Design a protein with these regions (language model features):
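Sec-dependent N-terminal signal peptides of Gram-positive bacterial secreted proteins and lipoproteins
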Residues: 2-23
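Active-site-adjacent loops and short helices of periplasmic peptidoglycan-processing enzymes
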Residues: 23-186, 193
Length: 194
C-alpha cells in the first residue's frame, strides 16, 4: 500500500511542478508553445526569467544544467509537505487512526476543516495533506508520529541530514512562515527526486 501512496505522491509532485500561465504575446520573442530543449551548449539561449531562484536539470542524468541562486536559503511554504509525507510514510502505518487535537484543529492557512476530536486514518490525512494542502492534517499527523510538532520537526531534520540536505531546516510540518524554516532550490529539487 505504501508503494501506491508513494506513486500517488510522485504523480502529485509532478503535477505541482507544472503551472499553466496565459498572457498576451506582446513582443513575439519566444513561442512558449514550442518545447525548449536545453543542453549545456545552448543554456545562454534560454528565455529571460524574473525568478529569484531556479534550477534547470536533466531528468535523465539527474544533473543540474544551470541555476540561479540555487544555493540561497529561502522559505519553502507548502512544499514542506513533501518531507512531512516522506517521514509519515516511513514512521506510521497507513491504517492507524489519528485523533485530531485542538492545536491541529485550530491550525491556520489551507485546511481540511478538521476539528478537535475528529478521527481519521493516516492514509486519509495524507491524502488531505497532499491533495488539499491541509495544514490541519499536517499538524495532526505530526503530533501522531512525533508526539508534538517540535519533535516531528526534529524527525524531518534528521531525515534531511540523512539525505545530505545541509541547507534545509524544518520547524513545522506545513511550511507556514518561520525564519528558521528554509531550504534552497537545489535541495528542494533533491527532495522531489525521492
Amino acid at each position: 500500500m505504501k508503494k501506491i501512496l508513494y506513486s500517488i505522491l510522485i504523480f502529485l509532485l509532478i503535477l505541482l511542478n507544472f503551472s499553466t500561465v496565459c498572457a498576451d504575446d506582446v513582443d513575439n520573442e519566444v513561442d512558449f508553445e514550442d518545447t525548449i530543449e536545453v543542453t549545456a551548449s545552448n543554456v545562454s539561449e534560454l528565455p529571460k526569467t524574473n525568478s529569484r531562484r531556479y534550477i534547470v536539470y536533466d531528468r535523465i542524468s539527474k544533473s543540474m544544467i544551470i541555476g540561479k541562486n540555487e544555493d540561497v536559503k529561502s522559505a519553502m511554504a507548502s512544499t514542506t509537505k513533501i518531507m512531512t509525507t516522506i517521514v509519515i510514510l516511513e514512521k506510521a502505518d497507513l491504517n492507524e487512526k489519528v485523533t485530531v487535537s485542538a492545536k491541529a484543529g485550530g491550525t491556520g492557512g489551507s485546511r481540511l476543516g478538521l476539528k478537535r476530536g475528529d478521527k481519521a486514518s493516516v492514509r486519509d490525512l495524507l491524502y488531505g495533506l497532499m491533495l488539499r494542502s491541509g495544514n490541519d492534517a499536517a499538524v495532526a499527523l505530526a503530533e501522531h508520529v512525533g508526539g508534538s510538532v517540535k519533535e516531528f520537526a526534529e524527525l524531518m531534520n534528521e531525515k534531511a541530514i540523512e539525505l545530505g540536505l545541509t541547507n534545509t531546516h524544518f520547524v513545522t510540518p506545513h511550511g507556514l512562515d518561520d525564519a528558521n524554516h528554509y531550504t534552497t532550490a537545489l535541495e528542494q529539487w533533491i527532495m522531489k527526486l525521492l
